[in-house]
A protein has these predicted regions:
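Acyl-donor (CoA/ACP) binding surface of acyl/acetyltransferases
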Residues: 1-32, 61-180
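Conserved GNAT-fold acetyl-CoA-binding loop/helix
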Residues: 29-49
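Short, P/G- and charge-enriched loop/turn segments at secondary-structure junctions
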Residues: 49-51, 147-148
Length: 180
């Protein structure tokens, strides 16, 4: 699948993206709210997990590109959120591209695709409660906090969600999407 927004292209990740993804997932500042940054083997597993999800589900975390350059990942994955497997919108953007709206734009596109192409009744984002940039991105895309809980692996987590009806009422074409 390929998703085009006004500034970004989201596409399936390949092994050719390893170096660019490793630069993001191994960076201590970027991965501050994860248990630890990823090593090379972990990044290879990440890419394989994404590719397996494309084959099994038709969705996953896609490579986010700006003018052909890999700047992060964003997409839909099924995650165990407080004991339930739910469709989650997740994102990681290279830190030299933070605060430019790319995470919000990519996430908005993925929310639209989750509702329009995959028919999910609601989508979720969850993150460490201290990860303010991430929960602000969720809120910018119309999500509201619906839960909070402590997880042995990630600590205290906030859960945000938006259902399809709410999304349709507030949907704008700020981030027009063309998915192929």
């Amino acid at each position: 699948m390929r998703i085009d927004t006004s500034r970004l292209v989201l596409r399936e990740m390949t092994e050719d993206d390893f170096d660019a993804l490793y630069a993001i997932l191994s960076d201590a500042e970027t991965m501050k709210y994860y248990p630890k940054p990823y090593d090379e083997a972990g990044v290879h597993r990440w890419i394989n997990w994404c590719r397996d999800s494309y084959a099994k589900n038709g969705f996953g975390l896609w490579a986010v590109t700006l003018n052909g350059e890999f700047i992060g990942d964003c997409g839909i994955s099924l995650q165990p959120i407080n004991g339930q497997w739910l469709p989650e919108i997740g994102y990681h953007i290279r830190k030299d591209h933070w605060r430019k709206g790319y995470a919000s734009e990519a996430a908005a596109a993925c929310i639209r695709v989750a509702f329009e192409q995959f028919g999910f009744p609601a989508v979720y984002s969850y993150m460490n409660a201290d990860n303010e940039p991430s929960w602000r991105t969720a809120m910018k895309n119309g999500m509201n906090q619906v839960d909070a809980y402590t997880d042995d692996h990630h600590g205290y987590l906030r859960v945000f969600a938006i259902d399809r009806n709410t999304w349709e009422k507030q949907c704008t074409d700020e981030y027009a999407v063309h998915a192929k």
